[in-house]
Structure formats: structure tokens, C-alpha cells
Swiss-Prot record:
Gene Ontology annotations of biological process type: DNA-templated transcription
Residue runs in coiled coils: none
Function: DNA-dependent RNA polymerase catalyzes the transcription of DNA into RNA using the four ribonucleoside triphosphates as substrates.
Gene field: rpoB
Top EC class for this record: transferase
Family: Belongs to the RNA polymerase beta chain family.
Pfam families given in the database record: RNA_pol_Rpb2_1, RNA_pol_Rpb2_2, RNA_pol_Rpb2_3, RNA_pol_Rpb2_45, RNA_pol_Rpb2_6, RNA_pol_Rpb2_7
Molecular function terms, GO-annotated: DNA binding; DNA-directed RNA polymerase activity; ribonucleoside binding
Protein name: DNA-directed RNA polymerase subunit beta
Listed HAMAP family: RNApol_bact_RpoB
Organism: Yersinia enterocolitica serotype O:8 / biotype 1B (strain NCTC 13174 / 8081)
Gene Ontology cellular-component annotations: DNA-directed RNA polymerase complex
Record has Transmembrane as a keyword: no
Amino acid sequence: MVYSYTEKKRIRKDFGKRPQVLDIPYLLSIQLDSFQKFIEQDPEGQYGLEAAFRSVFPIQSYSGNSELQYVSYRLGEPVFDVKECQIRGVTYSAPLRVKLRLVIYEREAPEGTVKDIKEQEVYMGEIPLMTENGTFVINGTERVIVSQLHRSPGVFFDSDKGKTHSSGKVLYNARIIPYRGSWLDFEFDPKDNLFVRIDRRRKLPATIILRALNFTTAQILDLFFEKVVFEIRDNKLQMELVPERLRGETASFDIEANGKVYVEKARRITARHIRQLEKDGIDRIEVPVEYIAGKVVAKDYIDENTGELICAANMELSLDLLAKLSQAGHKQIETLFTNDLDHSAYISETLRVDPTSDRLSALVEIYRMMRPGEPPTREAAENLFENLFFSEDRYDLSAVGRMKFNRSLLRDEIEGSGILSKEDITEVMKKLIDIRNGKGEVDDIDHLGNRRIRSVGEMAENQFRVGLVRVERAVKERLSLGDLDTLMPQDMINAKPISAAVKEFFGSSQLSQFMDQNNPLSEITHKRRISALGPGGLTRERAGFEVRDVHPTHYGRVCPIETPEGPNIGLINSLSVYAQTNEYGFLETPYRRVRDGVVTDEINYLSAIEEGNFVIAQANSNLDEDGRFIEDLVTCRSKGESSLFSRDQVDYMDVSTQQVVSVGASLIPFLEHDDANRALMGANMQRQAVPTLRADKPLVGTGMERAVAVDSGVTSVAKRGGTVQYVDASRIVIKVNEDEMYPGEAGIDIYNLTKYTRSNQNTCINQMPCVNLGEPIERGDVLADGPSTDLGELALGQNMRVAFMPWNGYNFEDSILVSERVVQEDRFTTIHIQELACVSRDTKLGPEEITADIPNVGEAALSKLDESGIVYIGAEVTGGDILVGKVTPKGETQLTPEEKLLRAIFGEKASDVKDSSLRVPNGVSGTVIDVQVFTRDGVEKDKRALEIEEMQLKQAKKDLTEELQILEAGLFARIHAVLVSGGIEADKLSKLPRDRWLELGLTDEDKQNQLEQLAEQYDEMKSEFEKKMDAKRRKITQGDDLAPGVLKIVKVYLAVKRQIQPGDKMAGRHGNKGVISKINPIEDMPYDENGTPVDIVLNPLGVPSRMNIGQILETHLGMAAKGIGEKINAMLKKQEEVAKLREFIQKAYDLGDSVCQKVDLSTFTDDEVLRLAENLKKGMPIATPVFDGATEKEIKELLQLGGLPTSGQITLFDGRTGEQFERQVTVGYMYMLKLNHLVDDKMHARSTGSYSLVTQQPLGGKAQFGGQRFGEMEVWALEAYGAAYTLQEMLTVKSDDVNGRTKMYKNIVDGDHRMEPGMPESFNVLLKEIRSLGINIELEEE
């Protein structure tokens, strides 16, 4: 493998045995591709904005004299960039402009004669844009639109599995689900009649819908039944015979023909009898007359002489009727063929319970069901039915729905109309009847071929269409009002409803979620999440076990491990690593093609529907060099079952062992040795890890770390290769390689880094360069590390030296004992940034004022404020300190004469304002790192705001000037090269000022042209700089667009440094979580023979019952990795020759059976080897991919190479006594995470605070400064102890005895420590409730 210069800095040793056939795809593509599809111009009009416009336009007036046509649309440029939107609290969006054409037709002239055409571009609101990391900035906060897994449109056949009816009879049903429009359900009832429901309303006999489609009874019977024809000849009854139909019947008379008896009376007819009849070609037999009684007539029979109806279709025949028919001259009688086996008379029975007789009565019946209480008219009934399933405006199956519908009915073509046809409805009924008759299977609703993904683009398009439809009605009315000659398209379109619909979706839809931004992994997982909840999806309460369960089709599409614990389990899933959606929105996963037992490198993506037809081998099947299966029998999956197949039967093979799991689960090393429940917790807790001060790469990883760090977008990645020309904490400048430049550009890439910004979860986002001056860079290299990344690898926690042993009960019940050294070295110190805002409003009594002049506040409290009343940057503040001084006018109160006198003498006016300053919340302390002031347009800016503005302008100017200088330097270097090659001496040039170079003339025409081109570029660059500077200046100095009534907003950012402390929650990656019980002095920690103390002591009892053995293997492998690091460190300290170092490191990389990774250090220069060694001395990072990890043998070999015992256990000594522990202890390195459940955020104690209004009891919860509830069971406990006075105190003065608790104050102040309990307020509430029931209850005073 070829490594770039940056990748050579630290190479992770890989234990994977299977070669990586397919690279890990870009992990955010599900979001980005979907949104791209939504906003890009699609000439076909299949999807996106284009599809929405085409489905609503053209809009015609009611009279048809005019129409508004859609031509095209374009998206403008966003006003602010992403960062500015976040600071200002606005939405990152682009204006949508649509070109519309108003066509007016002549009234009197023939149809289609155009009178006038007007075309105009109309503004249609703002469309939020996706940032390059797949998020949206809505009102200044980053949000993610989660993809939804919903039932695919189409037709589904299902049964109630015998749960509905008490008899346990299985009732079958069919449901046609459109993409938009009314649902159509067919269902059997326990009496085997077929019913229909529209939109889950009252059921009607299913034949009503056929009558509404204009079928007569005879036509209906013709559709669903085969016929038996009886013929009356010479007073004898003959029946047409199809021998196959006799299967399973018992003969009720002798079946004979041509004098030969084939079946005797009362004998069962067998297959032999049928063969005999077929062989002899018997096609009619004589039957006794009684046989026809009870048969059902297939059509109407009329007496042609009198014109009267003898018997109607679907009537049962009797001998009387037969005689009448015979008299009327009907010699042939068609009856329905039914039997009990597989041709039951469901439709015939249903017709008998159907009250309607013709189309109109059927339509009226449907109208009554849909609109109860409204008088039906013929027209209304016809319109309603027409609009239900046959109008393109109201009903759409969509391409997916039509494809699923046709596949379900086994049709060949998969395309067709989006509305239903007669055939569609009758074929669904036929298939349902076949299933009831035992032919065919019901569908599996949880099969991923029946559930599809709706991503951002599709949901946004649907919302946009909803907005357009709202506008459509208004436009129609406007077109019908007349005076069209003066109208322009923009007079008709109101952009409000459209932008409101879009805004509502992005701002408050259930699937538009506040982004989880704890660390890069939580961002990526949130964007790859798939939810079955949300509009048009399931609800938590109604979802049963089946929906939540893992289904065989999840394999390689949805992760079986990563899902939340609790009520949402199984409803919220995560996309597997390689999964993607196809054009229809079904999930598909890649497989390698197998031909004749040879695995090729051809890769096909299969959806769950296609996968069912193939035999698929697992990724860990053993192959020889030519890609043949070594074993004759291979474990494969086929039709959702796993079994053994011979190697020639195999069609496909899995691409990778990680294919099954999601990104989160694929980061857990030795996942294959963990119990699934614990793996689930492990995958979920990695997302809660807080980025530490200094990220530390995991010693034991899985090889996925780099992909996650790069794809998450928190790192800065090189767009093009080149050399590092300049680097500091806030920017990196790359001089681009010649071959990657565009013609005629300066060839400089500038990367500005994010410094100390707040994330959604209040953690700190900060980027640090990880390249040095002059280093060569390749495209895709990581230039700067973000939060939780280390040299471009995900680093969520820290490698800790752990020992598994009990220690004085401090690790009882999963508690964790931590060494003081961890605190001293700041291993788990995290920075949290809080944003506090102070809003100054315009009130009825006058504007609130931000000022340092606050009434009744001492000098000390104002010491950290400047003259504008805003805190200084860098001030260290604690709970209760004033950050922004603000006063609010209060209403004039009636003054006493004395006060009036004092006022008159001293002119004091201070009492008409009250202090409403922004203070630091209790329990928070930190450093002010930034202040932002936003002032409304037209309000005068205060001194601080002007200072900030000045500073921003300076910074912007500095940035742009530096950028210009860098670009100029690059350009002049090229000018210099042209001039020198054109024959001008270099030392003469160096004496000339640079600006004069461009005035020089060259004899060589080519060179002169080049020079002129460069000169043009230079001018362009300068004018570009001026433009940029102007735009920046405008943005910084303009007033801000604030909410109505708001004059000013001051935002203060506090950075809080949190060290690890008892009560914080920590976890490993295997679901092994615990709370810190004690920070132990270093000297008391157990230590080894070299005197190295351990950092963390974990309880060994937490392992066996939880079955997450992965943590033990990780510990051993971590120890080995550290051991090798120690050896490298020793060699570096001794300053051994590079050759020795190279040999040892090479040995470490070559160890094990890995085929994929071949690190050849002989191609590295000495400097590169030394730099690699420098990065490996703290431990050699190791990758052990999921399901393909290091074996026990390999771990032992690595331990041996590191000079450590292969048992993984060492002798420890007690730090307090120095005695040796009785037996050896497992010690090693485990990757530990600090989770975002910090004791500082949870610890809370109430003094005296606010009370609930009705009950007068203290509120609950930290946010309300509430108390601890002393509930019913706690009362029982005090009762049980007989602690009467304590109980009385709890229920009265400490809770809701209003007078008692105020008296208590007075008593304490007076030094009298008695209490006088009164009546609790809740008792009065009880009295009031009883009175409200009409029972008067009064208390008698004694």
C-alpha cells in the first residue's frame, strides 16, 4: 500500500485477514445526494423542485380563459455564509425565483387562440440550504433531517393471524396504499363475505365498488367465476364436464358415459378417475335433475315471449325454476362453478348482502359512507368517487407504488399510470380471493422490500408541493376575477404560504431534529439515522414487537445492534456501513459476484427484493489465491435462512465483514466477543463521549477511525495536493502542485480553522493544525484535527492503564476507582462553552436599557463590567455575577408625602427602574471568551458594540490582506519565472520594485502574452479584494434583523473547564459503564514491579454475567501495543541506529497472519522512520476489524514481542502497605470515555425557592430550582418509624403550609426554634375538589 507523507506519520497495524475489496463509501452521502436531487434542475421532471412545479402548474382559471404556466426556476446566492448565520441566529437559505408565464386566451375566438402572453420572474420564498456536512442551519442552530422508513406505496396482502375473531379464524385483507390519496382496503369477515373500506372508514360490501365502476351483476360473476353449462336434451339433463374440477369431490350419482361407469355413487373421486376421464375424452355426462338444485345462475334469463325476468343472475336454481326455463325455451343454462376446496362462492355471497343494484345506488352508498349527514346528489356522488382514486390531483401511486403494485400482481411491465384502473381493482380482489382459497402467500410487512426510505430531499419536496397547492387555489380565484390585462404573474403569487410550509417542516417537523453534536461520531450517526416514527410513520404506542425486531433483510442494510434502549427500541435504526438507497428508495447493499465457484471483484448492489433469489456466501468464507472457495460446503444465506450450500451454487459473496453493522458498532474492537445487548450500549455510549482537552488515539481500534473522522467534516481536509507554505493556529496555506492547478489561477489554497466555538451540546469545537511548514500534502490528507480527532483518526477518549480487581469496595456495583494522576495530567478534562443571552426590549413603559448604572448594586458587583455595562472578555466569573447590566422601567407607584419631599430635595429618580441584569446561573463558573452585541437597525450602537465592530473590521481586513499577500506572492513568483525565462536577469529584477515588473516588455511573443495574462489576473485579484472587503464591511456595519420589539441582544460566551470528579459517568466501548466513586491518591494505587501505578481499577465481577469479553481482549492487546511502544521509546532514548529501529518496527508490522496490510519500511527515509517511531513510542496503534479481528495466538505473539507475559496478567503490590497481592491481576490498556452525564450538571440542592400556584408546594427539578418530592411511600416510611414530628414538619412547614413557613422564618430570626404547623394548602385543594362535585364540606373551628 502506498502511504502519503502525512499518513506515514503514524500507521495503524492491521490484523484484518480479508482484503478490502470495496472502500468505505462517503458516510454522509444519504443526506447530501438526496438534497442535491431536490435542488438540482432535473430536465425530466422526475424529482425535486422541478417535479413539484410540474405537478401543480399550469394553473387554469375556472373559465379556462387564462392559465399560469411554469417555465423554470433558479436559486439565488445566500446572503450570509454558514458561520455568520450561526452567530446571527438566522437561517442559512437561498432565495427561490421562478419564471412564470401568464397566457390569456381570446374569449370569442376558437379554442386555443392566444390573446396575450406575459412572462416574469417571481420570488417564492427562501429554501434552506444544506451545509457541506449534511446539516441545515435553522434560526442559527444546526439541525439534521432524519430519514424515515415508511411503508412503501403499493398493494399489500395480509392476514390478522386469527387474532380478530374469537373463533381464531384467519381473516385475510388487501390494502392499496398510494403515495398520496385515499387508502383502499379489502377484507373478509368471519362469514367469508368480502368487504371494502375507504380510508379506514365504515366497511361496505366489496361489490359496491365494482357496481360503482359500472359492472352489472352478470359481469361481476363473469369476472370471478368459472362456468358450468347444463343442457336440457330429450328431457334429460346433461352437464359439461371438465374432469379436473371433480378432484376431491364425492360422487352423488354414478358418473357414466357411453355405457361405462367411471365412478360409482358415494365413492370419492381420485386422480386415477380423473386421468381415466381425460384419457377417454369425456366432455359431458348425464346428471340427475336434482343435481342442479342449489346451483347459482350466472346471468339473467328472460322469457322472450312476455319479456318478464324468469331468474336473475346470482339466483339459486330450484326444480320449479328449471321447469320454467325449459318452458321458455332456454335449453342451455350457465351456472357458477364452486366447490369447498379452492373455488368458494365469496363474491356470490357478498352480492347477496349488497344492498345496491346499479351504479347510482352504489355511488350514493359510497357518498353516504364518506360524507355522513350530507344529502347526496348524483353529481356530488360521481365527483367524489371519481376524485377518490381516478384523479391525478388527488391520487398518486408514484413510480415506486406502481412498480410494487405491478410486481405484486405478477405483471411484466413495472411502469404505468399513477392512478388506479378498473383492472387494478379487480385483479387485487382476484388475488385476495386466491389467497383465501389457499393459492399464494400473504406479504411480510417488515420485509425491507416493503419498507422504503424517505430522505431529506423527498420530504422537502412534499412540503414544498403542499405550499404550492395552497397557493394554487388563490391563483385560480385571482385568474377568474377578470381585469387580466393589467395583471402580472407576481400579483397572483403570494410567497408566504410556500415559505411557511417549508419553514414549518425544517423548523418543527418531528424528523427535523436538533443535531447531536457531542463528538464527530454522534454527528455522523445522527445523519445516518433511520426512523420509523414521524408523519406518515408509526407511533411508539402502536408499534408491536414484529416491527421493532431484527428481520433477515436487515442484513447489510440496517444495523442489528445500534438502536436506542427504551420506548424507541427498534423503531430508530442506523444505516449499515455500506448500505445505500436505490432510485426507488429501497435500501441496497453491495455483494461480490461469484461465477462458477470463483469470487470476482465485480460488485453489484442488491435490494432486499432482489436478494431473495440468490445464494449469498458470508464474508469470512475462506478463499484460495484464485478466489475459489476452499471448502466444498459454504455457509450461505438464501431466502432469509442460513444453511450450507455447495460452492457451485453460490451466486454472491459479502463484500466485507463490517457490512452488517453501522458506523458506531464498527468502531468497537472485538465486537464478535461481546454480547449483543452490551454491544448496543457500547455503540450508543460512544456517541455520548465528550471531547477531551487533548485527544488520544485509541491503541486498539478497528481501522474505521480515519473514515469517520474525515467524513464527519470536523477535520480540515486538503482539497488539492501541494506544500504547506504557512501555518498558524487559525489558518493553513497550501501552495498547490502545478499539475492540480486550474489554468490561470494563483495556485494557493487557504484553510481557515474553527477556534473555540460552541457546539449544540455545549462542548467545545476547536481545530488544531497537524501539518508543519514545508511538508508535502496530498489530496485528502488531514491538515487540521477537530474535536475528538488525533492525526486524522477519531479519538473519543483516552488510553488508560486498568487493572481488574476489587479495591476496598470502591468498585462495588460498577463503580470506578480513578487515580489522582488522571486528574493531574488533565486526561479527562473537558471544556464546555455556554452561551448566555441578554435581550433588551421595548416595553409599554419605555425601552429597557443596557447600562452599568444599576440601582442598589455595590461597586464590587460592577467591577467586571465596562462603561457600557457589558462584561470584559477574559473575566473570570462565578454564579450570581452580573454579565450584562440591564434596567427595566417600572410603573410609577404612589409615593408617600415623605418620599415626595426627599425626591424634590435630592432629585432622585432611580426608583422607577428595576434591575433585570443577566447574571451567571448558580453553580456555573468560567471565563468569558467572547461577547457579541446585536443592535436593531436605527437604534444607536453603544461604545462596546462599536469597539466590537471595529475589531471585526480590523480582523476581516487583516485576514483579507494576508490572503491577498499570499496570493500576490504566488502570482509574482510565476511572473518572475516568466520574466527570467524571457531573458531578463534575476538580480536586475530583484532591484526593481514588484509593481514595475508588469511594465516590462519581452521580445518573445508567447512570453509577452503570458505576462499580460498574469497582469490581468493581478488587476482582477485586486478588484476582487476590494469587492470582498466592501461586502464584509457592509455585513459588519449593517444593523441586525431582530425579532419585533427587540432593541438589542448581547450574547456572552463562557468557557467552563471541567475536571473529572466523583459522580461523573465513564464507560469503555463494550457497554461497560460506571460512575467514579473516588479519586485515589497516586501512592495508594496498586503498582507493578517497576513501580508503575495503574490509572483505573475496575471490578472483575462486571464481566462474566454481562458477557462482554471484548473488553478483556482489548485490555490484553492494549498492553501489547503499549509494550511495543515502550521498546521503541527505549531505543529512541538510547539513540540506537535507525536500521535497528527500522528492523524492530518492521517486525512488529509483519507479525500475525494479516494478508491485507503490507508496510514496507525499506521505502521510508530515515527521517520518516524516526518520525514514525516518535509517534509510536506511546504505543503502537492497532486495528482489529469487526468479525475479522486479532486471534488469541496473535495477541500472545504481540505480547511476547513487547516483552510481556503472554497470560496478560502481572503481579501487583498494594500501594498502601507495599504488600504483594495474593494472585496475579489482569492489567492492560483500555480505551475509556468520559460521557456527557457530568455530576456538575446534575447536582442540585434547594434552599428557599418558588412554589407551585395551586398546591403551594415547592416545584420539582433542577431547572425550576425545585425540591425533592417527599411522596406517598416516603410518608409510609416515617409512619413506620413512628417519627410523628418529623412527618408533621415534612407535610406542613417544609411544604405547603403557607403561614407556617413564613412564621418559621420569623422564629428562626428571633432565635426561637419552635414551629407552629398550620393547615396544608393541599387540604384546601381537596376541599375545593369535593365542593366542585356538589358536596358542601365545611371545617368547624374548635
